[in-house]
Amino acid sequence: MKEIIEKLAKFENLSGVEMTDVIERIVTGRVTEAQIASLLLALKMKGETPEERTAIAQVMRGHAQHIPTEIHDAMDNCGTGGDKSFSFNISTTAAFVLAGGGIHMAKHGNRSISSKSGSADVLEALGINLDLKPAELGKVFDKTGIVFLFAKNMHPAMKYIMPARLELGIPTIMNLTGPLIHPMALETQLLGISRPELLESTAQVLKNMGRKRAIVVAGPEGLDEAGLNGTTKIALLENGEISLSSFTPEDLGMEDYAMEDIRGGNAQENAEILLSVLKNEASPFLETTVLNAGLGFYANGKIDSIKEGVALARQVIARGKALEKLRLLQEYQK
């Protein structure tokens, strides 16, 4: 382990084999917490390569729980977090809209690391049981078309890494890894990151992980979602090819809103915001959700443009389909 950390300290990249060996040692409890923290910091300072990120994701996913389900076209819209925006739970709210629009949503998430409320926190506040067994979660998904997979429970091996992450208190490669290690074999994905310079490389990792179609999104002001406060950049993975583009609210016929307009609060406050959006109450929260759900519909390939996706998202919310999915999840995942 010492040799690996020294190599990273010299800003030398690890091979896929080296990274695989290191992570296998970590997730089997053979590395100290201090060494793990040193590794995470060294990788962050050097900058993580697609090969390193793919290796860690493949190892972590190999140690994940298996969710038995009859659904084979699941999608996730988990972001990396760590953007310090303190926004409401955008992707979690959008997940219900996507599910209401007919997409099988297996939302994968965790408690907050660097914000006030993570997806697990807000859903727990809404009465969702985070601790169902894998077989029970599979049944929920088959019955409702939506399920929440609590990352802490899905990845027992993460217990070896979490203390170092919490002690560091800053985004690391594990933030970048979380959305890549979904327990299910996803076909499509919308993945938010707060570092636009990683758009293309993250799309490459998704390709390496077997995604058929995906969008990696980086919003304005470091937001790890699409934003209405400036230019949003995306990388689209389609037919094995990666293309980069960007858009503004004006491009989609939407109004601008400042970051302050979408600030959230604690889990209970964010739960109230989520409910207000699904009830179609006009606000910057609603508009931001519509934008991100629209991008999700486009990432899934359900529609042919982001603008069409936004229109579909509005329709789903207005017809009560998104709220219906929340009520179903509250009924079955309890």
UniProtKB/Swiss-Prot annotation:
- Which residues hold Mg(2+) 1? S91, E225
Q: What is this protein called?
A: Anthranilate phosphoribosyltransferase
Give coiled-coil spans as residue ranges.
none
Signal peptide residues are none
Provide the binding site for anthranilate 1.
Answer: G79, N110
Complex and partners: Homodimer.
Q: InterPro entries attached here?
A: Anthranilate_Pribosyl_Tfrase, Glycosyl_Trfase_fam3, Glycosyl_Trfase_fam3_N_dom, Glycosyl_Trfase_fam3_N_dom_sf, Nuc_phospho_transferase
State the gene name recorded for this protein: trpD
Protein's organism: Streptococcus pneumoniae (strain ATCC 700669 / Spain 23F-1)
